[in-house]
Amino acid sequence: RPGDEIAFPADVTATAETRHHDGSWTLAFGGDEPVEVLLERAGRMPLPPYIAGKRATDAADKQDYQTMFAARDGAVAAPTAALHFTPDLMAALAETGIGHETLTLHVGAGTFLPVKADDTADHQMHAEWGRIDAATADRLNAVRANGGRLIAVGTTSLRLLESAASDDNLIHPFDGDTAIFITPGYRFKAIDGLMTNFHLPKSTLFMLVSALMGR
């Protein structure tokens, strides 16, 4: 409830301020330290439920559960499809003429939530912040214009690309929140394929993959 105090590990405390319509809360942390410092001290790596349900987090997770592309703080989960990539693999792909581009999406806690509504239209998606700069958008559009294909690595990248795409299948610069919910029947505009991992039943990401498969 608003006004409740929450005690975290490492002597970190916060007061519950506001509950939002999507179920999230705004917390006010005590003390003068930046919230990023407090989270680093008291937080734990938010492993996916299929891992966290089998074991506790350990020190190695901080390195292992991080992609080679990670550059900015803000996401509460790693885009796990990208964990398969290494500098050596990227170099090998480049030698065959396969390029890559990067974008930023701060994955939110909603990525862990199952769909509980009987009708998917009633499911409330959590908004996530993302950014695609103009130069990246231009290069991505040029790939298709020259007969190439765009393969999204992970549902994270796919959601942001589709949020930035217009009905004429062009990707535009994007800087803001997206709450896109892709379900069967959706017409994809930005991508030609997807590389992804397995997904849990009744999850929004499972529905996204079903939409891409035409089911």
Regions found by a protein language model. Name each.
Residues 1-215:
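Surface-exposed, charge/polar-rich loops and edge strands
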